[in-house]
Structure formats: structure tokens, C-alpha cells
From Swiss-Prot:
The gene is cynS. This is Cyanate hydratase. Belongs to the cyanase family. Its EC number is 4.2.1.104. Catalyzes the reaction of cyanate with bicarbonate to produce ammonia and carbon dioxide. It catalyses: cyanate + hydrogencarbonate + 3 H(+) = NH4(+) + 2 CO2. SMART domains: Cyanate_lyase. SUPFAM superfamilies: Cyanase C-terminal domain, lambda repressor-like DNA-binding domains. The active site is at 96, 99, 122. One of its GO terms (molecular function) is DNA binding.
Amino acid sequence: MIQSQHSQTARHALAETVVLAKARKNLSFAQLTDGTGLSEAFVTAALLGQHALPADAARIVADKLGLDDDAVLLLQTIPLRGSIDDRVPTDPTIYRFYEMLQVYGTTLKALVHEKFGDGIISAINFRLDVKKVDDPEGGSRAVITLDGKYLPTKPF
């Protein structure tokens, strides 16, 4: 039976356990994802408490991390989503995304509406990908793809 959570406490605690086990076993999120049939971004989000994993994927990941049956069950529950408090993020990486939306949020909104009309980009029917590429000027660049289904507003 599908279960859902009413608070973030249990999944936050499990996320801490996952991160510690991942570090102890020196595993990457890509290694944890192997064999699940899911994307690295989705599995990572699930392990950090933002998605439910299918039963087989939950078992595969839990076995790699040495987690118990309760953790397997918890990984399958629908979480209470949202990991950022109602304040400006202080983590530098998360803050940069916040800053990007502060600077480009209205631009993204204007361009999406101009190209698609009134509506939203789904975060449910959604794909996320992060790639590291060489910068021709030296160093590396992060290429982040946000791929969401467009959902038009329907008058009623």
C-alpha cells in the first residue's frame, strides 16, 4: 500500500544516515543509482528526502548502503517535499541558484509565457541533469538541464 509522510523529520534523519553511509563506503550518487533504472538526479533527490523510490530501487540502494528494512520502507514513502526553510539559503551552492532566480526569474517567466502562453513548467513531470564540461577559457563549466512538461492554465 502506498504510504505518505506528514512531516519531514523521518526523511531528514534518513537522509543524514544515507550521507554518512555513503561517505563510510566511499560511494558516489552515480554508483548508488547503478542498477535502479532511474536517473542519478532522481535517486539523489530521493535519498535526500524529496522523492519516493520504487520498491526494487529502494532495496538496491539500501543494500549498497547497508540500510535496514525500515529504511527501505521509508525510502518508498511519499515525502513531505521542500528542503529549504522559509529564509534565504546560506549554503553557497544553493544560494547561487537562489541568486540565479532572483536575477533571471522574471526573464524565465517572460520567455516561457511568450513561447508557451499562460501556464507553468511541471516539477512533477520533470527531468534534471547535471554535467561537467571543459571551459574553453580554462577550468570547468556546469551544464544544468531543467526539462519540465509545460502545463497551460485552463480557464474554468
